[in-house]
Amino acid sequence: WVVTFVAYDCLYYWKHRFGHQWRIMWASHSAHHQSEEYNLSTALRQTSTDYIGFIFYLPLYLAGVPTEVIISVGSLNLIYQFWVHTEHVRRIGFLEWVLVTPSNHRVHHARNPEYIDKNYGGFFIIWDRIFGTFKDEETDRPCVYGVTNQLGSFNPLWANLYVWYDTFLISLKTKRWSDKVRVWFKGPGWYPEDAQPLKAADWQYPSFDPDISNFYKGYSFVQFWVITAVTLWLPSTQDIVSREFMLTVFFWCIFSLYVQGTFLE
C-alpha cells in the first residue's frame, strides 16, 4: 500500500504536468484553474472531460497492483488535495520541503508569470524539487489566481468546453496538416503562425464580477441545491424508473446548470 501510494503520486505528478503542457489535456484540466478565488470550492471545480488521464496509471496495473488498491490510494490522494485549497494556512515549517501545502499549491494556481507551470505535486512536493518545477511562494509577490485567458463566465458547461472549442477552431483555421495535429499536443500558449489569437494572453485583468440582482442570486442558490439533490437521487432509481425518464432528468439537470450560469452573468 505504501509503495503504491508513493508510485501513484509520482505518476500523478506527470499526469498533472502534461495536463498543463498538452492542450488536449489542458482542455480538460483548465476548468479547475479558471476560478479567480482560491478556497475549498476551487478544489471542487473538477472536469467532466478527462478522457485520457487514466493512461498515466497504466504502469500500476501492468505491475499487477490490484484495482481496489489503486482506487483507494487515488482517493486518499484526492482527499488530501482538497484541503490545500485555502488561503487561511500560510506556511507549515519543514513540511514545506516534503508535502504539497496550501502555500506551494497557491503558487500552482497563480497566473503571475513567475508562478506559471510550477508545483504539480499531489501529495509530495519532492517530485517538483527533483524534476525542476518547484517554486516557493514569495511574500512580496502575492498570488493572483485564474488563467491568463479569462473565461469571463459562470456557466459550468462553457467552463468545461471552452478550451476544447477554442482548440478545435485553431485546428480548423490553420492550413498545415502538421499544425492541425500539433496544436493538440503543444502548450496552451502555442499557436500556429497562420492562426494567431486576436488578443494576447494577459495575466493582469479585473476579476469577473458582474452585478447580479438578489432575485437571480437567490434563484440560482435554490436551483443549485435542487440540481444537487436530484443528481444524488437519480442513480438510486435505475432499477425503478425507465431509461427514458433517467435521460430526461439528466438533460434537465444539464439545461438547468446552463440556465443557472446565464442568470449569474
Where is each model-derived feature located?
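Membrane-embedded catalytic scaffold of the fatty acid hydroxylase/desaturase
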Residues: 1-152, 156-160
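Hydrophobic alpha-helical transmembrane segments
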Residues: 1, 14-19, 162-170, 194-196, ...
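A membrane-cytosol interface segment of integral membrane proteins
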Residues: 142-188
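Short, charged cytosolic
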Residues: 17-26, 179-201
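Substrate-recognition/cap regions that form aromatic- and gly/pro-loop-enriched pockets
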Residues: 209-265
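Helix N-terminus capping/helix-initiation residues
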Residues: 39, 155, 176, 213, ...
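Hydrophobic alpha-helix feature that most strongly marks membrane-spanning transmembrane helices
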Residues: 135, 186, 259-262
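Membrane interfacial helix-start motif at the N-side
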Residues: 38-49, 201-220
